[in-house]
UniProtKB/Swiss-Prot annotation:
Keyword field: FAD, Flavonoid biosynthesis, Flavoprotein, Monooxygenase, Oxidoreductase, Signal
Binding of FAD, residues: 36, 314, 327
Record gene name: cfoG
Disruption phenotype: Impairs the hydroxylation of the flavonoid skeleton at position C8.
InterPro entries noted in UniProt: FAD-bd, FAD-dep_Monooxygenase_BioMet, FAD/NAD-bd_sf
Similarity comment text for this entry: Belongs to the paxM FAD-dependent monooxygenase family.
Protein name: FAD-dependent monooxygenase cfoG
Length: 434
């Protein structure tokens, strides 16, 4: 006997959030179609943190750490920018594992994307494989139908529409009636990404030192006067070193254009960090290319849901990278959606459950959004947090911040919210996979 197909759900955007949401919803028993405007034939990106607040779901969902090249965080050190001398190494009690009991991993963004795509579409496993429609540009939304309109003019209806279309979201306008204003930080407004092969480093005796003991080692080098920083950690089974260079650039008129495809001359970038240890600059020079990510943020929005349509990921809470929680918060959205929509039936029921999703997710995502943005714009302050937290709840120290971000189970929070809505609510045995 065939199981019920559940709801017909459309997800717009097949990035990390969209694919994680598709995985969560297929496990909840629904039929999922993703519409992605690109061909996804040349995925790009640098590395990404996969912290405990989401690795706790990805592992039981089938994440094979070795297959996808994830690297377990082993050590975090702060080095002097001009000498590379170690100033401080976090003790075991201050690591993600020590504080939460769960691991933090480093992954190449392409590998995480590939893993989530496999989870969402694999023939075996709980639920029905999600279907991805590439080169399908969505040009209009109707949250009340709900439906989407493709560039071809085709209108596609569903029980639920989820806008996971990223930082340049059009879906958000359908929810709140206007575009979300983008803002440039007052400080640290530019991020350069380098991916340096470990083999290239090893081939030069002058740079081999960077490979020594580098398994799972994250290194942070901050120049305190200007706030420039360099962060490095390995990914793809320790075969690639990911470097993030943060700088403030006041005279660039094109800073609001977020373009991962734009390439920049490495010597020109390194001149901006010329006071850093020459050995580090030599390591960076081994990168085949470098990409710039203009750091642009948005303030929290106060509505994610309208009718039978909602938002997830950067579409509703784009944030700066200083807490390395952007991707993780999108995955938390995905898990919450899988929980609240499990067993949904009628239109009225769906709308109420999407409101529960908003209540579960909006406060937490907004807090992390503000905390992330505080790292680069001093006009974003504690005052912004007071809308969401009392004074005694605010995470001021690094310890408190890590506990707040990492030691959190969104599935449990969403489950408790659903139990208040419907005391008979149950999660299917396959959903968490634990």
């Amino acid at each position: 006997m065939k199981s019920s197909p559940g709801l017909h759900i459309i997800i717009v955007g097949a990035g990390i959030t969209g694919l994680a949401t598709a995985t969560s919803l297929r496990r909840a028993g629904h039929t999922v179609h993703l519409y992605e405007k690109s061909a996804q034939d040349n995925e790009i990106g640098a590395a990404i943190y996969v912290p405990p607040n989401v690795s706790q779901f990805l592992l039981p969902w089938g994440l094979d750490l070795d297959k996808w090249g994830f690297v377990k965080s082993q050590k975090v050190s702060f080095l002097h920018h001009a000498s590379l001398e170690t100033k401080m190494t976090l003790s075991d009690g201050m690591t993600a594992k020590g504080l939460t009991g769960a691991e933090l991993y480093y992954a190449h963004r392409v590998d995480l994307h590939g893993c989530l795509r496999w989870m969402a579409t694999r023939p075996e496993g709980p639920g029905r494989p999600a279907t991805i429609h590439l080169m399908s540009n969505v040009v209009a939304y109707d949250p009340l139908a709900p439906s989407i309109t493709l560039a071809s003019g085709e209108v596609i209806s569903a029980d639920v529409v989820i806008g996971a279309d990223g930082v340049r979201s059009d879906a958000v306008e359908a929810i709140i009636g206007d575009k979300v204003q983008t803002m440039r930080p007052r400080f640290a407004n530019t991020c350069y990404r380098f991916l340096v092969p470990a083999d290239a480093i090893e081939a030069d005796p002058a740079t081999q030192f960077w490979n020594e003991g580098s398994d799972g080692w994250s290194r942070v080098m901050i120049e305190s006067v200007t706030g420039r920083s360099v962060v490095s950690y390995p990914c793809r089974s320790n075969t690639i070193h990911n470097f993030v260079l943060i700088n403030n650039e006041e005279n660039d008129t094109n800073m609001c254009a977020e373009d991962w495809h734009a390439r920049f001359k490495i010597p020109d970038i390194l001149k901006k960090f010329s006071d850093y240890d020459p050995r580090l600059l030599k390591v960076l020079s081994k990168a085949p290319d470098a990409r710039r990510w203009p750091l642009i943020y948005r303030k929290p929005i106060h509505q994610w849901t309208k009718g039978c349509m909602t938002l997830a990921g950067d579409a509703c809470h784009a944030m700066l990278p200083f807490l390395a929680q952007g991707g993780a918060q999108g995955i938390e959205d995905a898990v919450a959606l899988g929980v609240v929509l499990q067993g949904a039936t009628t239109r009225d029921d769906i709308q109420k459950r999407l409101q529960i999703y908003q209540e579960v997710r909006m406060k937490r995502a907004s807090i992390i959004q503000i905390l992330s943005n505080m790292g680069a714009d001093h006009s974003v302050s504690v005052e912004d947090l007071k809308e969401y937290l009392n004074e005694d709840q605010m995470p001021y120290s690094q310890h408190d911040m890590m506990i707040h971000n990492y030691k959190y189970d969104v599935a449990e929070v969403a489950f408790e919210a659903m139990k208040r809505y419907d005391p008979s609510f149950r999660l299917g045995n396959d959903f968490l996979g634990r």
